[in-house]
Design a protein with these regions (language model features):
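Short histidine-centered catalytic/ligand-binding loop motif
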Residues: 20-34, 118-141
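Active-site loop/lid in soluble adenylation, ligation, and acyl-transfer enzymes
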Residues: 1-109
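C-terminal helix-cap and adjacent tail motif
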Residues: 181-210
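A long amphipathic alpha-helix within ATP-dependent nucleotide-binding catalytic cores
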Residues: 129-161
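Conserved metal-phosphate-binding beta-hairpin within the catalytic cores
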Residues: 80, 160-180
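Phosphate-binding core of ATP-grasp and ATP-grasp-like enzymes
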Residues: 98-115, 146-159, 182-186
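An exposed, glycine/acidic-rich loop-and-rim segment of catalytic or binding clefts
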Residues: 98, 102-117, 122-130, 197-201
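A short glycine-rich, hydrophobically flanked beta-strand micro-motif that places a catalytic Asp/Glu
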Residues: 55-61, 153-169
């Protein structure tokens, strides 16, 4: 069975302000889906070159669709932080921009009603979301993605602050990076220290990779 992802023009944010950390759709930007697909294709192929398995198989840019592996995708987000930002600062009363070395890793349950709570390995297994060892394997993949992504963005004069990925697994339990790798999943700083929204960041990256 073939599976395809459609990249739409919707963007997350609230009150007309675009924010990759938001869980609500804040508007639509013409052409965003196509740009997101071009960027995702670029980064998925980069991950594969670095030995990180992804669900990406092929892409049709004109149609805005990506052909992907059919996988089981648990309702989790794997989060890596190189600096404090966003919800972490609100949760723990921390100033923005404090560095983490090594990076800070979190796993959250995708549940808007509960506010995407943090979840442990034990709870993931208790709820039947993950099998034994998959939590730690997911964190290992997250760290490896972070290293590749951080270096690639640094070459574009962008400093990676934090990002989140989703991970799926096949019938044998092998794990893959899924969904997308676009400015919708990360925060970055430019050379001026400004954090561009995901629309501006996408255009910045598109100009670099084309």
């Amino acid at each position: 069975k073939e599976v395809y992802l459609l990249f739409k023009d919707s963007a997350t944010g609230e009150d007309g302000v675009f924010d990759p950390g938001s869980n609500t759709v804040g508007g639509s930007v013409e052409g965003k889906g196509k740009i997101g697909l071009i960027i995702s294709k670029y980064f998925f192929e980069l991950m594969e070159k670095n030995g990180i398995p992804t669900h990406y198989l092929d892409a049709d840019i004109d149609k805005g669709i990506m052909k992907v592996r059919q996988l089981t995708v648990p309702n989790l987000e794997f989060v890596l932080r190189y600096f404090t930002a966003g919800s972490m600062c609100r949760r723990f009363t921390l100033p923005e921009g404090l560095p983490f070395d090594p990076p800070y890793l979190e796993v959250t349950l995708k549940d808007d009603e509960q506010g995407d709570p943090l979840i442990t390995d034990r709870l993931c297994q208790m709820k039947g979301i993950l099998k034994p060892n998959q939590y730690d394997e997911g964190l290992d993949i997250l760290t490896r993605v972070g290293s590749v992504l951080k270096e690639a963005l640094a070459e574009m004069n962008l400093t990676l602050i934090d990002f989140k990925i989703e991970i799926g697994y096949d019938d044998e339990g092998k794990m893959y990076v899924v969904d997308e790798i676009t400015p919708d999943i990360w925060r970055v700083k430019d050379e001026a220290g400004t954090i561009p929204n995901q629309i501006d960041c996408a255009q910045l990256i598109l100009d670099k990779i084309q």
